[in-house]
């Protein structure tokens, strides 16, 4: 089994650990009712429709 040959600096350690937190921005889709941008699989905040049904 491999053993570290040199001590890793704080900067390199922190840089490696920070990568897992990066999350892509969610894609936006156009609402079929009012044509505003909204998050997918959620009701439109502008008109209140979700899957062609008024929910809000």
UniProtKB/Swiss-Prot annotation:
Gene Ontology molecular function: any one: structural constituent of ribosome
A GO cellular-component term linked to this record: large ribosomal subunit
Ranges of biased composition (kind: Basic residues): 7-19
Keyword field: Ribonucleoprotein, Ribosomal protein
Domain of life: Bacteria
SUPFAM superfamilies reported for this sequence: Zn-binding ribosomal proteins
An individual GO BP term: translation
NCBIfam families documented for this protein: rpmF_bact (TIGR01031)
Protein name: Large ribosomal subunit protein bL32
Name of the encoding gene: rpmF
């Amino acid at each position: 089994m491999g053993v570290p040959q040199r001590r890793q600096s704080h900067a390199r350690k922190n840089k490696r650990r920070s990568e897992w937190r990066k999350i892509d921005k969610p894609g936006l889709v156009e609402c079929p009712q009012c044509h505003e941008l909204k998050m997918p699989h959620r009701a439109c905040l502008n008109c209140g429709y979700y899957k062609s049904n008024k929910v809000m």
